Amino acid sequence: MKKKKLLIDVNSIVPYYVSGKVNGIGRTTLELLQALADIDNLPFEIELYSQNMKGIGGRNTGLHFECSHFYLPHREKWNKILTKFPIREWFTGYDIMHIPHNFEYVHCPEKCIVTLHDALFIHIREKAFSHEKMKEIVPPFINQCKHIITCSEYSKRDIVETMKVDPQKISVIYWGVKHEIFFPMQVSKEILVNELPFPLRNTGYFLSVSCNNERKRTNVLVESYLQYSECASPVNDLVLVWSNPPEELTEKISYSKVKDHIHFLSNISDKQLSLLYNGATALFFPSMFEGFGLPLLEGMACGTPIVTCRNSSLDEIGGEVVFYLSDPIDKSIIEMLKMFDTDSVDCRQKVEAGIKRASLFTWERTAEQTVEVYNSCLTDSIRKIC
């Protein structure tokens, strides 16, 4: 009997092979693909699907899956055209398609599994991510699709409540950690100086792994550090993996007395990121909303003390092994900076518990649970052209 075919849309990983940069969704999609490739004797066939004019897609992964590529622009206009006719269905002959990036224009949503990472666009409008448009198109789409995967119990509840989706239609599958990269290690100053592109002082540093989204509140962290420096001389520098900080913030830093203590980094490899986690006095992640919170998990796996917020999925992932900020957030950050700066906090128990907690999250487990969803959906699917 011929195996059924699962088609995975891999368009979210294309930027990685173009520029070496990828967002959180692209990164987790790539990790899932690599973990799926390590599973022997899958009861179905996997094929990777991509669409762009450069010819970049599944073949670039080097994985053993079959690959299909459409030489069409991956733009809304063209994707809407593809919904009019069963072109993907004819071309690939898939039984079920997995869309791991929240939404896609498709001809037959009833044959789709969608990974909806969160319902952020319902609560917070970020123009750069077309959240107004997503609020309009995503809810009807996911109500039509065959099944939904999301990455936290919080996100599941939020999707059910805000988009009126049947909870039986949603599977929670946590993301994982690459434990072969993110693990506790002894990191000397010499190693950090040789591996990292910033001038490290003789003291330690606080770390932030974030981006320019306002909800991440990375700007609040920087402002709090500047405010703290007005009444104390920080022992720890502030290192931010943040490629595009706003000009008004960098200008404000340039006039401060701690301008040489604040470092912005970009294009960091996973190996360098692991070193940063391991060398940090603490990781600060003051986000106001997350569907998961991967930096928390990576930091825990490296034995880094974590400071974050008790909101959205963050306390679900952090549990009782992290330090939580309170409102007002800026004052709470300053208090935490002071506590770690003056060595007045004992974090050994939380660090040890964090390493143990992070060990429960693996990409192998993520892939195995995803395969269970694939199997369930393929078992009751009827191969037909919509």
Q: What positions do the PLM features span?
A:
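Carbohydrate transferase catalytic cores enriched for Leloir-type hexosyltransferases
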Residues: 1-386
